[in-house]
Amino acid sequence: MKFYGMLFDKNADSLFTRIEQDYQHLKAVAKKLPQGLSVLTERKTGSVWYVPGGRSTIGILLKDANARYVFEDDLHSGSLAMSPEQILSKGKDIDVWAFKYFGGAPLTRAQLLQEYDGYKALHCFVHPQIYEVDTSTEPYFELTSFHPEILLREFILLSHPADHAKFSKYAKDIRKLGALRFYHRQLQ
């Protein structure tokens, strides 16, 4: 952000400082909560399921959200190309599944099963905790690149649902964070 400010002769310091303060505040809020639910991101593409490495931006955001990320111990800073079988063996007990897609209409569980029947082995598929963001209608990439605090807030809310028994003691604090901005719960 500061780099773009220098390119266009704008002062980006105050905006960067505000974003950093918001991020650190949200990180502190998440740290006070019990560890969140387990989260799996993305979905199968062809014969590969790409997931963020444990040291990737998304991996760090999930850690800062105090979520349990399946690949949090991984040392890669980029994407991991895994077979669906590897994902299912490591992540079959996942609580929350959050992914991005480009489509114009919400994906249904039936459509996901047409894409890959193995999804039904995921705990979060059987006990639906599926969240999706349609990048054709939401400015996800445009905003989250410069506003990581928005994505951190999303991951806190996804991994600490206020209506979950584990977090009922903290429901008031969680609800103060507001509603999800990008991710929408899949209802079908």
Label for each model-derived stretch:
Residues N11-A65:
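Basic- and aromatic-lined ligand-binding clefts that recognize polyanionic substrates
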Residues M1-N11, R18, F99-Q188:
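Structured C-terminal subdomain patch of bacterial secreted/periplasmic proteins
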Residues M82-D93:
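Short helices/loops that flank or line small-molecule/ion binding pockets
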Residues Y4-N11, Y23, K27-A30, R43, ...:
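Sec/Tat-exported extracytoplasmic proteins
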Residues K32-Q35, K63, S89-G91, L122-V126:
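Extracellular/periplasmic catalytic domains that process cell-envelope and extracellular macromolecules
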Residues I58-S79, A98-Y101, E132-D134:
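His/Asp/Glu-enriched short active-site or ligand-binding loop at hydrolase and phosphoryl-transfer sites
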Residues G46-W49, V70-L75, E138-S145:
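Active-site rim elements
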